């Protein structure tokens, strides 16, 4: 029969605790013990080479850090936090002033995924043995001393994790959680054999990485429904697990992902300094992504009974893990309804279209087999399942390039001879020069990698390894792919500006380029009539031929430019991709950007990710989705379409089964991604006035969730500026 301790376990207290900590954990709560032990480790390893500093330093921390256990824990692993005393706060401030959040030899920065499949296949013990065998071989053959030291450090990291797991078993035993202790002892010395052991192994590594090793870890946790399904089926067949117990373990895993977080929002609120911050809590506001569903390398949908359990147990008020569901035209209908239900209740979930993303990855240079294994890491960046490194993300700001060209044209006297085709030609040449220069600089840095091996030892280098362990860093080419990403930022602002040039300047001749340039220079002061013409011009998101045509034309320019970039000749496979991502730069860059031809005044926010500009969706949600679906995406592999929907509309649409059909139609028409905030303007404004009543109000920012009331007033106002998009 299924494990009695799991059958009898309640899960309500776990959820209650996680929600309480998300809402009420003091903002100055600090992982102070971690800071103390890291400072001790820094002194102990001062004279060692970096790989040994990393190995022995992590050993010191993991051998001594406390492992809190609560009676309701199903998975073991927490980090101690406290509000520092006056003395503790002084120590914290002095230590951070001296070494930062971590010492220089700890250099993990997250924004990546691991080879979770290899961890689950070999376990910590197998990975250690693999590295030890390679180390022994290099010693026998008198290999490079730097490589030997690198491997010695890697072996120490695996040993540190295994010993930490044993210590966690001791803590569980002392707390009377004997089944959990047995699970931990098993994975300390063997590869995981059961569903619980596999999930516990994932959590041990995630916990250490996200709270001790990496600053802003932003880790993707892999395709756990696919990776864990055999463990689940075997346990079901042997009678040691049932569906309910698996759901409890998954729910506790979700809870654990939330209790380690700090308070606040890191992109806009963090600028105001009124939240936890990365120094107090390395995990703070990092989104950890968990991937479900999608196609496998054979083109078959991986939706299974475990996918359903993972989706069913999502807690709508949690921030993490941020679920990435991969839609395909074979997606299980019942699972699809559940996914859309979670999307509609405001859960931390986003959906990608496998057919679009996989095709873009293949066009960018990823093999079809590897493209099918793609994952996203926060915020909305593509990766090849723990097998890629992203040394470059360049933000191509076409809307500011348009402003630069208007200035150039006004000064060179060519405005009278231009038409929209000639303007596009100049825009393409201008962007091409910038992109080529940035790519050449990045590629030259990557070309130097082999000469500087083995590089800096990090925890990620121990878990982004395939079957063949390579004794050098991820940032020196130990993974199979190097991805160069060229982002189109503020897409709609650029499209809407080009529409004004085409329709009002070149076609209808409502005003000249010179008139427009003077109006922009003066921030439209004295030119309100001209501004209103710009504001009322067609806008991207209205699904009309003019704006959709300019969307295609702009994206095609970007495609042509980056398709010519030569990523060959690297130590691994070079890949060039595009993305429609902005993070929260639409606010920050908007504050720095002059007035734009779409009628936007200086300082106002620019458009966000793949979304239309604020106030432009006058033709409703369906038109907005169809505009987004029609934009070409041949090499666009990621990007967030943030949609804010009225709660009443969504609830009624769910009752009538309209919402799942609407989202499916969007994807089947070529849509790439969607993420939703389900609220109303009245609710947002009420939350500003009475935050204590709305602590559960979660909103989507760019590829992560935030508690609306914990955002700064500046960030809240920027969010409210997004209009509701309803049918």
Label the model's feature ranges.
Residues 161, 165-173, 177:
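Secondary-structure-rich domain cores
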């Amino acid at each position: 029969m299924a494990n009695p301790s799991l059958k009898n376990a309640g899960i309500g207290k776990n959820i209650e605790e996680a929600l309480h900590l998300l809402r009420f954990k003091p903002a100055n709560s600090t992982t102070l013990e971690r800071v103390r032990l890291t400072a001790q480790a820094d002194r102990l390893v001062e004279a060692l080479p970096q790989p040994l500093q990393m190995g022995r330093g992590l050993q010191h921390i993991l051998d001594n850090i406390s492992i809190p256990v609560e009676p309701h824990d199903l998975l073991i692993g927490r980090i101690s936090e406290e509000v520092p005393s006056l003395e503790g706060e002084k120590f914290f401030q002095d230590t951070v002033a001296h070494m930062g959040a971590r010492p220089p030899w700890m250099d993990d920065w997250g924004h990546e995924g691991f080879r979770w499949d290899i961890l689950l296949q070999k376990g910590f013990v197998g990975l250690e043995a693999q590295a030890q065998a390679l180390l022994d071989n290099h010693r026998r053959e008198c290999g490079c001393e730097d490589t030997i030291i690198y491997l010695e450090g890697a072996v120490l990291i695996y040993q540190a994790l295994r010993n930490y797991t044993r210590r966690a078993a001791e803590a569980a035993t002392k707390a009377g959680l004997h089944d959990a202790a047995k699970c931990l002892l098993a994975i300390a010395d063997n590869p995981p054999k059961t569903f619980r052991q596999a999930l516990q192994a994932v959590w041990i590594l995630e916990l250490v990485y996200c709270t001790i090793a990496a600053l802003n870890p932003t880790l993707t946790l892999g395709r756990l429904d696919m990776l864990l399904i055999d463990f689940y089926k075997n346990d079901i067949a042997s009678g040691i697990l049932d569906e309910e117990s698996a759901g409890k373990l998954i729910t506790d895993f979700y809870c654990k992902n939330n209790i380690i977080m700090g308070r606040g929002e890191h992109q806009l609120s963090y600028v105001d300094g009124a939240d936890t911050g990365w120094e107090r809590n390395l995990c703070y506001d990092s989104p950890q992504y968990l991937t479900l569903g999608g196609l496998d390398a054979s083109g078959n949908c991986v939706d299974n009974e475990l996918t359903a359990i993972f989706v069913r147990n999502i807690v709508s008020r949690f921030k993490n893990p941020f679920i990435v569901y991969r839609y395909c035209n074979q997606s299980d209908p019942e699972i699809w309804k559940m996914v859309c239900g979670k999307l509609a209740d405001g859960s931390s979930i986003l959906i990608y279209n496998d057919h679009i993303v996989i095709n873009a990855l293949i066009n960018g240079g990823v093999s079809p087999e590897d493209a099918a294994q793609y994952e996203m890491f926060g915020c909305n960046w593509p990766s090849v399942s723990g097998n890629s490194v992203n040394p470059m993300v360049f933000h191509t700001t076409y809307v500011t390039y348009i402003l630069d060209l208007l200035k150039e044209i006004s000064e060179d006297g060519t405005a009278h001879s231009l038409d929209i085709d000639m303007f596009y030609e100049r825009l393409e040449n201008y962007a091409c020069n910038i992109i080529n220069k940035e790519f050449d600089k990045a590629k030259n840095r990557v070309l130097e990698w082999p000469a500087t091996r083995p590089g800096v030892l990090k925890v990620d280098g121990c878990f982004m390894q395939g079957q063949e362990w390579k004794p050098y860093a991820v940032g020196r080419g130990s993974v199979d792919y190097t991805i160069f990403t060229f982002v189109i930022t503020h897409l709609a602002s650029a499209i809407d500006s080009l529409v004004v040039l085409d329709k009002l300047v070149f076609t209808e001749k409502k005003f000249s380029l010179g008139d427009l340039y003077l109006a922009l220079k003066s921030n439209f002061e004295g030119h309100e009539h001209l501004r209103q013409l710009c504001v009322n011009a067609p806008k991207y998101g209205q699904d009309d031929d003019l704006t959709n045509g300019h969307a295609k034309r702009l994206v095609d320019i970007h495609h042509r430019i980056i398709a010519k970039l030569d990523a060959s000749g690297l130590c691994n496979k070079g890949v060039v991709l595009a993305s429609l991502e902005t993070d929260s730069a639409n606010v920050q860059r908007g504050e720095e950007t002059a007035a734009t031809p779409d009628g936007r005044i200086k300082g106002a926010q620019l458009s966000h990710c793949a979304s239309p500009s604020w106030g432009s969706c006058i033709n409703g949600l369906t038109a907005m989705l169809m505009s987004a679906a029609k934009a070409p995406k041949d090499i666009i592999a990621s990007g967030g379409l943030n949609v804010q929907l009225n709660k009443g509309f969504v609830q009624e649409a769910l009752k009538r089964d309209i919402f799942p059909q609407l989202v499916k139609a969007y994807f089947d028409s070529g849509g790439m991604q969607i993420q939703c905030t389900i609220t109303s303007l009245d609710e947002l404004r009420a939350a500003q006035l009475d935050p204590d009543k709305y602590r559960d109000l979660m909103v989507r920012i760019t590829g992560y969730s935030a508690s609306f009331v914990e955002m700064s007033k500046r960030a809240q106002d920027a969010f409210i500026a997004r209009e509701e998009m309803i049918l």
